Amino acid sequence: MDTLNFKYVFLGQSILRYQVPLEIFHIINSIYENKYPELKPANKQLVGKIEKEHSLFFNGEDSDKMIKHNYLPTNVLMWFESMFRHYLKFNRIKGYKLHFNSVWVNQMFEHEYNPVHVHQGTIYTGLSSVMILKLPESFGVEYSAAAAPQNGRLQMLGATNGQFANVDYQPNITERDFYIFPYDMRHCVYPFNGPGWRRTLAANMDVDYDPIRNRGVS
């Protein structure tokens, strides 16, 4: 078995998990905490059943839901772009144009949740993300099946199906995790119970590309 010569071929969408540099992590948390009274509520354009949803960056079309603004320094914006470019390079996507659309923070308390949803920006093709900024000490009591905890979990639901396919992903999240995935990948966050809060960030990057040109690229 050690001498097998094989090549791994993956058909489907990918999720990449990164670790946020401490400097970026602390800057984002500090901006959220210190600028909180100034931050614009993002609830009108989000599906989450969450009271505290606030925007740090928006570069889409002005509307009654949101207008352009930015609370993030250049080095943080550049870091986000570099991560999205890495995802596209890893997935061998060529000939694309980027437009950084939005960044917001969800601070969830017990019983709040994010139902199954997808993302979009100015266009329908692009990459979204989840960054773990703060976690409570515990997600509370699991009232059944404690060996398979669900409280507070992030769940990604892939579009791939068929025999032997991995159809969902539910990571053991830790602070400084950063997950990048396509706009149309369904995902959700389950509620938790007990004290504390769960603070996460989402960032949307529009990716204008030709799927025909990129078909079968290797």
Language-model features: where?
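Short beta-strand segments enriched in hydrophobic/aromatic residues
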Residues: L133, M185, M205-V207
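A short alpha/beta connector and helix-capping loop motif
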Residues: P195-M205
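A short coil-to-beta-strand element that immediately follows conserved catalytic motifs
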Residues: I93-V103
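Catalytic core of non-heme Fe(II) oxygenases with the double-stranded beta-helix
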Residues: N106-I180, C188, G196-W197, P211-R215
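Double-stranded beta-helix
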Residues: N204-S218
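Residues at beta-strand starts and edge strands
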Residues: G12-S14, H99-N101, T125-L127, W197-R199
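Non-heme Fe(II)/2-oxoglutarate
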Residues: M1-K94, H111-N114
